[in-house]
Amino acid sequence: MYNVKSGKLLPFGVIEGVTRTNVQQKHHFDTLKVDWIAEEVPVALVYNGISHVVMMASPKDLEYFAIGFSLSEGIIESQHEIRSIDIVAHCRGGIELQIELSSRRFAGLKERRRNLAGRTGCGICGAEQLSDIFRPISPLPFTQTFSLNQLDYALSQLTSVQDVGALTGCTHAAGWINPEGKLLGGCEDVGRHVALDKMLGMKAKTGWQQGAVLVSSRASYEMVQKSAICGVEILLAVSAATSLAVEIADRCHLTLVGFCKPGKATIYTHAERLIS
């Protein structure tokens, strides 16, 4: 379906999204040590030849990012409205995701298009007015359930999608958990919103339906908004939820759970989907 190109090829066995640098450590200032660090690069999403947004992101799983961002921002309603994705690396370290939309979707995008430059996973940068921040979301149906007895098992698997994080300690993760608590897949990124977008793109492409999203970060309003727009009914976060995240989750009937730790969880909204 997608024509994915890349101007950057990595040798077999090299983990995408990491590089090395010399560092000095406390009590050993006279010694240089080689350490791994996570790459962070500008990624431009270009729709039908027109630049829409530049985000700072990890340079991996970019096809999933293109799909997930397009879905979670309401640019498309189905991945099938994307005709092609070209991933083009530029000489200065930036990357362009050249996305070709259907004519109908591109016409809709042009009506509300704005140029914005995001910091690491920041979704509010560049909004022209407050009404641009909160998109209308239809209330979610109640078709999913999740047993909190499976939460510890789910948490134990999340780091398996963080190859870069294991080397650098520098990434967030988002995963899709089935009702039995098994991690079906996930993505990592230096930005928590980008990690979620990548995972939502993976979910769309693989066709996962039953389950919940598990993120390694806090639950901000945008994490809730993106999840709800993509039809996710249950969002599990390792850290806390913000007041606005709770408000939006309640309004759109999303089950929001924070402080997901071994043996612990705080349920903020719509506990009726949860089985204890």
UniProtKB/Swiss-Prot annotation:
Gene3D superfamilies: 3.10.20.10, Cytidine Deaminase, domain 2 (3.40.140.10)
Active site: C122
GO MF annotation, one: sulfurtransferase activity
An example Gene Ontology biological process: Mo-molybdopterin cofactor biosynthetic process
Key word DNA damage present: no
Chain positions recorded as Mo-bis(molybdopterin guanine dinucleotide) binding sites: F259, C260, K261, P262, G263, K264
Coiled coil: none
Alphabetical list of SUPFAM superfamilies matching this protein: Cytidine deaminase-like (SSF53927)
Main location: cytoplasm
Keyword entries, A-Z: Cytoplasm, Molybdenum cofactor biosynthesis
Subcellular location: Cytoplasm
Highest taxon listed in the record's lineage: Bacteria
Family: Belongs to the FdhD family.
Classification via PANTHER family: FORMATE DEHYDROGENASE, SULFUR CARRIER PROTEIN FDHD
Role played: Required for formate dehydrogenase (FDH) activity. Acts as a sulfur carrier protein that transfers sulfur from IscS to the molybdenum cofactor prior to its insertion into FDH.
Protein name: Sulfur carrier protein FdhD
